[in-house]
Amino acid sequence: MYKYYKGETDAISNYKMVTKRSNNKINTNFLKKFINEEVAYSLANKITYTSRLGDEKIINDLEYYTCHWSKKHDSDLLRYTLLFGFCYELYYVKNNEMKVRIIKPTDGCHYENEDGETIYFFREFKKDFKDDIYIDVYDKEYIYHFDSNFKEIEKPTVNNIFNGNVPISIC
């Protein structure tokens, strides 16, 4: 479905040109139109939080930790969730701020135990201005860093987010 969203359709790519008639093609991407309208409609108003217990401190904490996130975060998250059926949010700390990165299912994979708890999360990525593929593996204690051949390129870093849980959420 992601290919269709990007405009790579079978109808256009496998089109047989015929010289005895007009070959004008109308390429209207209704899937992209539908998803973009769904995202715009769902997120037209700012997301607000309320506490069932009436605890304003929790609401203030949520707003404090998410105020520096990208303005497009919620729309990108919903768009990828609609396209793939689910996606991931990876949480990390940078410059003493809680950050989040959206990971598409084409770039990451998780493994659950029989109770539905996430045990591992694998993420494949490229660094800026490099063609090499890197893999990070997250578990409850460490983050392991590998190259595309699963050769360790750095010592594991301590996973100190989420109190002993894998730092992802599945959306």
Segments (PLM) and residue ranges:
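Structured, contiguous alpha/beta core segments that scaffold functional sites
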Residues: 79-171
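Extended, helix-rich architectural segments
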Residues: 1-99
